[in-house]
Amino acid sequence: MTPPPNRRNPRQERARATVDAVLEAAAQVLEARGLKGATTNAIAERAGVSVGSLYQYFPDKGSLVLALYERHLQQLEPAMAARFQEAEGLSLEAAVPHLIGGLVGLYRARPALHRVLVEEVPHLHGDARTREVEAHLLARVRAFLQARAGEVRHPNPELAASVVVSTVEALTHAAAREGRLQEAELLPELTRLVLAYLRG
């Protein structure tokens, strides 16, 4: 008997569950041990699968790191889309910390993991997907600034959007690498910097 078209194949369900378990185990082991200390044996053991099962989906640690980074990007896009929607009725002064707080909050949720991702992904050629997500974010920031032309004094909103996205991203990544994501001053300082730049 053929299963209903909307029902997932049990084999696919098991495969998805295995991949999810391995990714979460990899995240936990990377958080605890860092990239050098994380072994595929430890990850497989934490996930409750054999090393052979792990290698079916991920040939090495690099592929695991890239998959975790992809998961981060998948969380980033809808989270930031929601933040921009919430910011529509806010003033520039209120909207900027709300938006930056959304980004920083994602990194703060798992700081040790994001430290590994920030350090390792550039060496693993994860740039194409990063550029795609950054392009979407840049378009949102550009529209955000254009909608607040009366509050933004920068003469070139397109350039300003690029500078803001690049600066906030670079400083957040630096905080991740240096273990400073949880510092209370991070969000206020980023907010102060961006507002000063946009107001000229």
Predicted regions and their residues:
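Short, charged helix-capping/linker segments at alpha-helix termini
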Residues: 36-37, 152-155
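Generic hydrophobic, amphipathic alpha-helix propensity
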Residues: 15-26, 43, 68-80
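Secondary-structure edge/capping motif, primarily at the C-terminal ends of alpha-helices
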Residues: 80-88, 114-121, 148, 175-179
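Amphipathic alpha-helical packing segments from all-alpha helical-bundle domains
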Residues: 74-78, 94-109, 125-150, 158-162, ...
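Amphipathic alpha-helical segments used for helix-helix packing
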Residues: 104-125, 142, 170-177
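N-terminal intrinsically disordered/low-complexity leader segments
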Residues: 1-17
